[in-house]
């Protein structure tokens, strides 16, 4: 019944198996990928008719993670998989980027690739398997897929490169890099790194590239045995058509490209296609040429003009040389109510960035195949239509926005302080207010500025730069800080972010074959110099984190209590903790280890909540002084309420140094008095005294007994007086039981 074909290879000590002919047999291409206990089904379907006139290749990649792959039922009301998660979007883009450039340029048939995770093994990288499976499925389909792609993941642990590291190993790795390519070229790189040198990054790419070559071999073997006839493709347009357009309109195109302003240049270029189509109207009616052929030939001429100017004259659209960076302007603190803000402008690309602090309750909950976890740092990239002067409605975040946001997240995440050093959750929102190339790298620069202005103790400022490439034969030019048109007509989009010491994120997309490691070496070094120049400009505005947080930032502190007291703070049905939150206006987060984090909008609210928690969780010591309230007056003494919910008795002899006739002559119900704990009776009731209590230092925050885990407190990060210009010190609070500081703007 089944004509199953299987190919396998031992890869990094595990068997990688590709098979076809058993599942999804009606799809143009279908491959089951197995490694360990991970199983993926990857399919490719090609539309029978071309979709001409759309101006782009209609390729859609969908990566899906099925809940049953880990033996789970999806949450939510409908109990089924729904909208793609950010993780699924990111892996879909990861598959798309190395594959898209490898189709015949004239191929415009709608093509759908679906990669479904059917069984999940945390010891295997399913994103890598998805790229391999998608490439294999396309190689079996009729699509004119010109070369076969494979991929690998590279980690760096204890100075050694590790192929396809497990999730557990990645936690200790200095590098998380995905590289994809063909048998002779790298096509795509995506990475997050902990301040690695350019040489290390290049070596990691080489290591990954060499590692996936055996995988390409078995995909080729599978394709040879099971492939279907490929669609026959013609040239995108006749060479004679291009020559005729060039003869008639090249001067006008060159004049338009000579305009430095993006808007004016685009306006002039947009007028040309209509003139060209009008000239060839009779040929279109006679079906000698199609609109799509004419527009494609025109685009090719535009590309030739731009590329020749760069390669032959070392001159770019805006007049810069290949290494020049556009003019940079930085501004901080322009949004008074935000916790931190910055405006970063580089030429005609601009990003408005804000930083907001939250509590651990504001952390993003992520439900993935690995299980549920919380993300403390969130970065949202927004690309509104007005940034490129388009009249379009605002929509939900696109795949591009999710991808650009994640790249910026990778660039910033390695330099953030840990939760002990900085207990807040952090959200950064970067809105691209103008765009003419490299908006994701403007996001990185703006985010670094906004975080420093907000007072986040980052390890070092971070900047990002987008590099381009124009290559004809053996001649090539690497471009620093590319424009939108240079990205569109160029051969590479190479984004590098990092500090002055090393790289934190790298993303590379190559549109052509033949980009070797020599070109990549030149690009990395040129990017390093550009990054240092941008950092120099940023440092003129702010070079280190402010020493104080915004006055709008929440105050926070963390205390450690006995685990047995957690239930008392929560109360039946959460009654007690709700009452504390409602009366104080604070937020409280309790961990299983007895850590209690309290967040409030100001110092007073924080203190109210903290006092209430201590009243429940902390036992007073003999000799401690408290403010107490007289609850009931008797002939023999008075009952006093102190430390929230605790009661004690003051005997008449302990009320005053002088003899008194009656208790009521000195104390009345509701009176506020200072009392000292002097012991406990045989029933465990507290014995208090008022005598001389007001002469001692009072405390409503007693030091807990040793049997309460010493109730150690870790205060919110203290900021020194900015006028003293003292540096951040993560250990500055170790000698303090409690430190709650008001936050003020840094001037």
Curated annotation (Swiss-Prot):
This is Polyribonucleotide nucleotidyltransferase. One of its GO terms (biological process) is RNA processing. It is found in: Cytoplasm. PANTHER family: POLYRIBONUCLEOTIDE NUCLEOTIDYLTRANSFERASE (PTHR11252), POLYRIBONUCLEOTIDE NUCLEOTIDYLTRANSFERASE 1, MITOCHONDRIAL (PTHR11252:SF0). Belongs to the polyribonucleotide nucleotidyltransferase family. Residues 691-747 are annotated as: Disordered. Mg(2+) binds at residues 487, 493. Keywords: Cytoplasm, Magnesium, Metal-binding, Nucleotidyltransferase, RNA-binding, Transferase. The gene is pnp. It comes from Rickettsia felis (strain ATCC VR-1525 / URRWXCal2) (Rickettsia azadi). Its main location: cytoplasm. Its EC number is 2.7.7.8. GO terms for molecular function: 3'-5'-RNA exonuclease activity; magnesium ion binding; polyribonucleotide nucleotidyltransferase activity; RNA binding. It catalyses: RNA(n+1) + phosphate = RNA(n) + a ribonucleoside 5'-diphosphate.
């Amino acid at each position: 019944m089944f004509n199953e074909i299987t190919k396998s290879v031992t890869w990094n000590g595990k068997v990688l198996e590709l098979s076809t002919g058993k599942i999804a047999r009606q799809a143009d291409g279908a491959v089951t990928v197995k490694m360990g206990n991970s199983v993926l089904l990857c399919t490719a379907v090609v539309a029978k008719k071309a979709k001409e006139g759309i101006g782009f290749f209609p390729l859609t990649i969908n990566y899906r993670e099925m809940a049953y792959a880990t033996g789970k039922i999806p949450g939510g009301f409908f109990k089924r998989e729904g909208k793609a998660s950010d993780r699924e979007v990111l892996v879909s883009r990861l598959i798309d980027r190395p594959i898209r450039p490898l189709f015949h340029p004239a191929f415009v048939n709608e093509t759908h690739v679906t990669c479904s995770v059917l069984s999940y093994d945390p010891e295997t990288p399913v994103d890598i398997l998805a790229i391999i499976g998608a490439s294999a499925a396309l190689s079996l389909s009729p699509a004119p897929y010109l070369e076969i792609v494979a991929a690998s993941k590279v980690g760096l642990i204890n100075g050694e490169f590790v192929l396809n590291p497990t999730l557990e190993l990645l936690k200790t790795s200095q590098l998380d890099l995905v590289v994809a390519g063909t048998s002779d070229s790298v096509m795509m790189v995506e990475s997050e790194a902990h301040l690695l040198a350019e040489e290390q990054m290049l070596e990691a790419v080489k290591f990954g590239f060499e590692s996936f070559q055996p995988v390409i071999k078995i995909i080729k073997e599978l394709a040879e045995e099971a492939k279907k006839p490929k669609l026959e493709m013609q040239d995108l347009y006749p060479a004679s058509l291009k020559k005729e357009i060039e003869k008639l309109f090249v001067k006008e195109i060159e004049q338009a490209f000579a305009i430095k302003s993006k808007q004016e240049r685009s306006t002039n270029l947009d007028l040309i296609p209509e003139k060209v189509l009008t000239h060839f109207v009779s040929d279109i009616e006679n079906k000698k040429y199609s609109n799509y052929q004419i527009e494609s030939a025109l685009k090719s001429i535009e590309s030739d003009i731009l590329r020749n100017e760069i390669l032959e004259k070392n001159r770019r659209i805006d007049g810069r040389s290949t290494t020049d960076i556009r003019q940079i302007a930085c501004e901080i603190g322009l949004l008074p109510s935000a916790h931190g803000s910055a405006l970063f402008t580089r030429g005609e690309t601009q990003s408005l960035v804000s930083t907001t602090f939250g509590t651990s309750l504001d952390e993003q909950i992520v439900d993935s195949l690995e299980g549920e976890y919380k993300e403390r740092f969130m970065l949202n990239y927004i690309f509104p239509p007005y940034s490129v002067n388009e009249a379009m409605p605002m929509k939900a975040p696109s795949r591009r926005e999710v991808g650009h946001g994640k790249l910026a997240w990778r660039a910033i995440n390695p330099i953030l302080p840990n939760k002990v050093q900085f207990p807040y959750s952090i959200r950064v929102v970067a809105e691209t207010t103008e765009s003419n190339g490299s908006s994701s790298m403007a996001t990185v620069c703006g985010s670094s500025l906004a975080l420093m202005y907000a007072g986040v103790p980052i390890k070092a400022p971070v900047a990002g730069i987008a590099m381009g490439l124009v290559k004809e034969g053996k001649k090539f030019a690497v471009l620093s800080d590319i424009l939108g048109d240079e990205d569109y007509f160029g051969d590479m989009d190479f984004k590098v972010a990092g500090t002055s010491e090393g790289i934190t994120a790298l993303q590379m997309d190559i549109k052509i074959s033949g980009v070797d490691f020599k070109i990549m070496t030149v690009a990395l070094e040129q990017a390093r110099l550009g990054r240092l120049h941008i950092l120099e400009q940023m440092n003129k505005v702010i070079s280190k984190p402010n020493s104080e947080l915004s006055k709008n930032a929440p105050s926070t502190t963390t205390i450690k209590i006995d685990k047995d007291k957690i239930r008392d703070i929560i109360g039946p049905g959460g009654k007690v903790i709700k009452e504390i939150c409602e009366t104080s206006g604070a937020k409280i987060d309790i961990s299983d280890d007895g850590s209690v984090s309290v967040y409030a909008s100001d110092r007073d609210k924080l203190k109210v909540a903290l006092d209430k928690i201590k009243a429940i969780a902390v036992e007073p010591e003999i000799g401690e002084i408290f403010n107490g309230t007289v609850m009931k007056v008797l002939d023999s003494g008075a009952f006093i309420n102190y430390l929230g919910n605790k009661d004690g008795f003051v005997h008449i002899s302990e009320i005053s140094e002088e003899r008194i006739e009656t208790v009521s002559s000195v104390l009345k119900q509701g009176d506020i008095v200072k009392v000292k704990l002097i012991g406990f009776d045989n029933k465990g009731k507290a014995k208090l005294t008022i005598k001389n209590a007001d002469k001692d230092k009072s405390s409503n925050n007693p030091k807990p007994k040793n049997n309460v885990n010493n109730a150690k407190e870790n205060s919110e990060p203290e900021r020194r007086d900015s006028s003293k210009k003292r540096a951040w010190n993560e250990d500055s609070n170790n000698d303090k039981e409690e430190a709650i500081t008001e936050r003020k703007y840094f001037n």
